[in-house]
Amino acid sequence: MIDVNNFHYMKIGLASPEKIRSWSFGEVKKPETINYRTLKPEKDGLFCERIFGPTKDWECSCGKYKRVRYKGMVCDRCGVEVTKSKVRRERMGHIELAAPVSHIWYFKGIPSRMGLLLDMSPRALEEVIYFASYVVVNPGPTGLEKKTLLSEAEFREYYDKFPGKFTAKMGAEGIKELLEEIDLDAELKHLRDELESATGQRLTRAIKRLEVVESFRHSGNNPAWMILDVLPIIPPEIRPMVQLDGGRFATSDLNDLYRRVINRNNRLKRLLDLGAPGIIVQNEKRMLQEAVDALIDNGRRGRPVTGPGNRPLKSLSHMLKGKQGRFRQNLLGKRVDYSGRSVIAVGPSLKMYQCGLPKEMALELFKPFIMKELVQREIATNIKNAKSKIERMDDEVWDVLEDVIKEHPVLLNRAPTLHRLGIQAFEPTLVEGRAIRLHPLATTAYNADFDGDQMAVHVPLSKEAQAEARMLMLAAQNILNPKDGKPVVTPSQDMVLGNYYLTLERKEAVNTGTIYNDTNEVLKAYANGYVHLHTRIGVHAASFNNPTFTEEQNKKILLTSVGKVIFNEIIPDSFAYINEPTQTNLENKTPEKYFIAPTEIGEEGLKAYFDEQPLIKPFNKNFLGNVIAEVFNRFSITDTSMMLDRMKDLGFKFSSKAGITVGVSDIVVLPDKQDILDEHEKLVEKVTKQFNRGLITDFERYNAVIEIWTDAKDQIQNELMGSLEKTNPIFMMSDSGARGNASNFTQLAGMRGLMAAPSGEIIELPITSSFREGLTVLEYFISTHGARKGLADTALKTADSGYLTRRLVDVAQDVIVREEDCGTDRGLLVSDIKEGTEMIEPFIERIEGRYSKETIRHPETNEVIVNPDELVTAEIAKKITDAGIEEMYIRSAFTCNTRHGVCEKCYGKNLATGEKVEVGEAVGTIAAQSIGEPGTQLTMRTFHTGGVAGSDITQGLPRIQEIFEARNPKGQAVITEIEGVVDDIKLAKDRQQEIVIKGANETKSYLASGTSRLKVEVGQSVERGEVLTEGSIEPKNYLSVSGLNATESYLLKEVQKVYRMQGVEIDDKHVEVMVRQMLRKVRIIEAGDTKLLPGSLVDIHNFTDANREAFKERKRPATAKPVLLGITKASLETESFLSAASFQETTRVLTDAAIKGKRDNLLGLKENVIIGKLIPAGTGMRRYRDVEYDKAAPETEIVEEVQTTEI
């Protein structure tokens, strides 16, 4: 076997007949497969053992030689070599064709490569190949042009006139002869000359032909090899024939297709031997051609060959194509051993880094490890004995299993794996039952819930795999979300509710105002029922030993509540005592107002003091998230995960103690609801009157009515939330962020409000009832539209979002951090992203975690805030914005010079760890996942603004697709191509508006539709590329008008606009990586003296290389313009043919690659996965491969810490 890790590139080309014969182990002469009685392969047939190897290990066909000792011998009776039966997966055969046959990929593909090379139309080629016309190969004295087509009658006529003096042939033979006669160098010279003079269609064709001719010259492929004389037969194990239960056989479609070819070929041979009449031979040759076409690509020409039940047979091309093809089904995703799946259940008592594995599952997964251990401990005598012990589930097996799984992490995966947090490592603990136990805090990252979700378990086997799983993938390490660098592990539902309830304060709670010496006293009083969780008390501040308390404060009494004392137990000691849910309290110190000197307490005690003070808000979900982020910023990951576990335990404990329930009595209907409705009803009547009098249009009336009812709902909502008791369970759920929001509550107790019709428009008749009162039949009916649309949308969105992620991953999979610094001299100017006055992404968020390109000084003090190539941390970013600086140049992926990737400096910090990014990080894939994963949260709809045509703006997922596919947007904006002043705006024909721009040298006018809103007015100055009307810009046009930098910034802004409007935060750097991939090609305008072809798409780096060469040799450089490719197109244009072929249009990509003799340097991730090599990212990079692991190395500290710390 070849060691896949040892080769550096893979090349593809056309196979010569000699090459095909050299692969083959023998010629298949008969169409038979296996003997129906003996079930043994027929000699010389499609499964022949002599050609392909024995069907049983170390045994020849007739049984003369059995056993491994005869290895390598060839049986003298049956001629079969004694070897492993596995060779039947590798050995190929061949068929010697009686007549040459054209390869359908090269003749029928678009464009037809054969046609371009011969300068013949595909239709003419088809007529010749399928024996409808003759082609003139050698015109002789006939006066005919070479390659002219002749019908049967014309050929007879010329043949009679010039017998034996000219040659015209039919079928692939004629084409082969023409291909053999082609002089590529002469053709090249002729085409280069034609390029100088040709224009229009002729120029386009000349460029296409030049590309094909150049391909053949460079690749060393012979054009005649596009015609087959010998047909290879793939190994029999890859097209198997298996016996079914009923004695019948199931076989691969390929065997049928091969059988047809062999039958027709044998018949043709016989006819040629017999000297049959020409017309019969011709017909047989045509049938052979069709049989080979069907084998290579069934259905490409004419009707496909069908099997039983009119099902088209799957040809060799279909074996590669699509989701079920070889690439996507077997090479990019394989099923793996040492894996299992089961339903998940919650494991509230687990630590952050643990999961619960069902005993019987663990027994099966770790079987080989247990067997080894049983033999080593001498519990079992040998492996076989150990196996039977495990299968019997003997008692001693369980102890061994406990030891084996200790410190052996397993990977848990939930489908769909939308981002890298969809697979995480945990340390298994054994549990009873058959469900996998999952840590409740890990559910957010997996997007899992416990309503029947299933998860898969995988066991990393090698020491390196285990180390990687533990160091990089342990759930306790993955606290931050790679898309925005915020904690993804936040408490939810019960945990939030528990902590909210714990930190609640109540006025009339038992024994309010009691003063305690220390925490222990408080806990004892609480345990004995002397105080309640919500009781406000005083505690001597000194007893907390808190480093943030001043000396003065330590002499005072801290005013807090019992619950908060308990909550602060889980917070690290160096933090301020958290008494109120504010950033100041969290980051700096406990506010002074919560300290009271003993002398200040009046005679009535603290109770009277507390009665005057307002209650402090309890801690909600957002605040808990801030606490986690703050702990993460100040401490190690280990400390954070320990605190998270404590927070989870507190939450569960106190939400159970709270016993929060919901009853119908908790839903209190607003008393003055009817008055609010009547008031708004009057407003609607007023608007309708105005419309009836013709004072406003129907469009304005509709919008006004919608606005009135929205206002009514808002008013009811505000009054409802204000009138609710703070201890109302439903209010507590929504206020804490555990579940539900104000809108849900309004629907229960207030009114349901406006609903959408099936078309997406809003129905102006609101639903005035609430669920508590009950809906009328009409109201119920209206509301079903929205519910149905919601479900349908979700289903569509999931598929669309998944496909978007796949395309994004494909285009960016080879972007890896490849070096520390690329040394670029350019940077990206960043400032606030705004849409009108609305802030989309603030400046501070854009610079944090990036490297500066310039020295930034304080405008007043001139002090240096940040130096060039220095990382802008959160503190520095705050300093910059506090200094009033509103824009700066940063290092960006847009301006990075690294080939096939980015450098550390241009990328910035790794958001998943908060540290600087390391060489080897697969940032392209992370970027694709970060943009694709929130795709399901985006809306599907195109907003209809009251049904006016032309003003629909695409938003949500469709808009993201539109941007990344570089499509012409819906509701396109008009942009100006010149700088100048708006001279005039007038009405043109067909109710269009004409905008006239007067520049320095020229005046241009632009037409906009009558309904589009203008963004400029007469006399206004405009820059090149400025928007004249509302809408989205067409990016390809913008690129040619405003240039590369403006287009990059525009695309970045547009993507951020869509996501931020939906409340999804994605870091700029992810979008930058993707947009850069879309702009990495240029189109050659003039080739100069370089080897580049005019009109061809070339990678920017190859273009600069070619020009550098030209400058060195004092030659004319090439000129080119940047091209914006959509992600699908960009994936197919990638350097790697393996990656492109596994993505889409497999046959087209492979045809092209074979003719060009392309070489795949295996730089990306996909191509390495396909050939089974370690991926060149992370520890798979060559610079890390030479590192040997030390077998006796002591375990790292962090791991020890995770293991031994009890919480």
UniProtKB/Swiss-Prot annotation:
EC nos: 2.7.7.6
| Root EC class | transferase
- Cofactor comment in the record? Binds 1 Mg(2+) ion per subunit. Binds 2 Zn(2+) ions per subunit.
Chain sites annotated for binding Zn(2+) 1: 60, 62, 75, 78
Question: For this protein, what reaction is catalysed?
Answer: RNA(n) + a ribonucleoside 5'-triphosphate = RNA(n+1) + diphosphate
Q: At which positions is Mg(2+) bound?
A: 449, 451, 453
The cross-references to Gene3D superfamilies, in alphabetical order and at most eight, read:
1.10.132.30, 1.10.150.390, 1.10.1790.20, 1.10.40.90, 2.40.40.20, 2.40.50.100, RNA polymerase II, clamp domain, RNA polymerase Rpb1, domain 3
The record's listing under Pfam families reads: RNA_pol_Rpb1_1, RNA_pol_Rpb1_2, RNA_pol_Rpb1_3, RNA_pol_Rpb1_4, RNA_pol_Rpb1_5
Isomerase among keywords: no
Q: Where does Zn(2+) 2 bind?
A: 822, 896, 903, 906
Q: What does this protein do?
A: DNA-dependent RNA polymerase catalyzes the transcription of DNA into RNA using the four ribonucleoside triphosphates as substrates.
Q: Which HAMAP family match?
A: RNApol_bact_RpoC
Please give the subunit comment from the record. Answer: The RNAP catalytic core consists of 2 alpha, 1 beta, 1 beta' and 1 omega subunit. When a sigma factor is associated with the core the holoenzyme is formed, which can initiate transcription.
This protein's name: DNA-directed RNA polymerase subunit beta'
